């Protein structure tokens, strides 16, 4: 397995797909990276030379914030929003959707499993 940005990328996959295994690199950034380095997107990772791997590693680490640095930055942004008391920070704190989605129905991924609340008891006859 080849290592780029601290991630083992799969050897059998095409390079443009394998690069997306790095957190912070999607299809668009993978295409940009390959165009800038002049490496074909169709080549398999196992067929890359050491020089090409070094070239890819240098380009990605030099131009993009990826993996741990990006995760830390995102976490810091969320922490800052919570601390300043913004609406987004409040939604993060409560564990609710942040970007305006409805919560009357749906939003189960963010809210977690249903918690059943006891209903009102009927009066006995």
Curated annotation (Swiss-Prot):
Which GO cellular component does the record give, naming just one? Answer: small ribosomal subunit
Keywords, A to Z, come to:
Ribonucleoprotein, Ribosomal protein, RNA-binding, rRNA-binding, tRNA-binding
Question: Gene3D superfamilies under this entry?
Answer: 1.10.8.50, 30s ribosomal protein s13, domain 2
One of its Pfam families is Ribosomal_S13
Q: Which cysteines are joined by disulfide bonds?
A: none
Segments carrying the region annotation (Disordered) are: 93-125
Q: Which GO terms describe its molecular function?
A: rRNA binding; structural constituent of ribosome; tRNA binding
The answer to whether UniProt assigns keyword RNA-binding to this entry is: yes
* PROSITE patterns named among the record's database cross-references: RIBOSOMAL_S13_1 (PS00646), RIBOSOMAL_S13_2 (PS50159)
Q: Does the record carry RNA-binding as a key word? A: yes
Concerning InterPro entries, the annotation shows: Rbsml_uS13_C, Ribosomal_uS13, Ribosomal_uS13-like_H2TH, Ribosomal_uS13_bac-type, Ribosomal_uS13_CS
Question: Which BP terms in the Gene Ontology apply to this protein?
Answer: translation
- What family does the database annotate? Belongs to the universal ribosomal protein uS13 family.
Subunit info?
Part of the 30S ribosomal subunit. Forms a loose heterodimer with protein S19. Forms two bridges to the 50S subunit in the 70S ribosome.
Please describe what this protein does: Located at the top of the head of the 30S subunit, it contacts several helices of the 16S rRNA. In the 70S ribosome it contacts the 23S rRNA (bridge B1a) and protein L5 of the 50S subunit (bridge B1b), connecting the 2 subunits; these bridges are implicated in subunit movement. Contacts the tRNAs in the A and P-sites.
PANTHER family assigned to the protein according to its UniProt record, in alphabetical order:
30S RIBOSOMAL PROTEIN S13/40S RIBOSOMAL PROTEIN S18, SMALL RIBOSOMAL SUBUNIT PROTEIN US13M
Tell me what this protein is called. Small ribosomal subunit protein uS13
Organism lineage:
Bacteria, Bacillati, Actinomycetota, Actinomycetes, Micrococcales
């Amino acid at each position: 397995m080849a290592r780029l940005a601290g991630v083992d990328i799969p050897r059998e996959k095409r390079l443009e797909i394998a690069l997306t295994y790095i957190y912070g690199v999607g299809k668009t950034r993978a295409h940009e990276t390959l165009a800038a380095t002049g490496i074909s997107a169709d080549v398999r990772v196992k067929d890359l030379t050491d020089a090409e791997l070094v070239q890819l590693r240098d380009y990605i680490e030099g131009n993009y914030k990826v993996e741990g640095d990006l995760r830390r930055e995102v976490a810091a942004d969320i922490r800052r929003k919570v601390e300043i008391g913004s609406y987004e920070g409040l939604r993060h704190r409560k564990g609710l959707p942040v970007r305006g989605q409805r919560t009357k129905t749906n939003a189960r991924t963010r809210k977690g499993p249903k918690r059943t609340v006891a209903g009102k008891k009927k009066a006995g006859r």
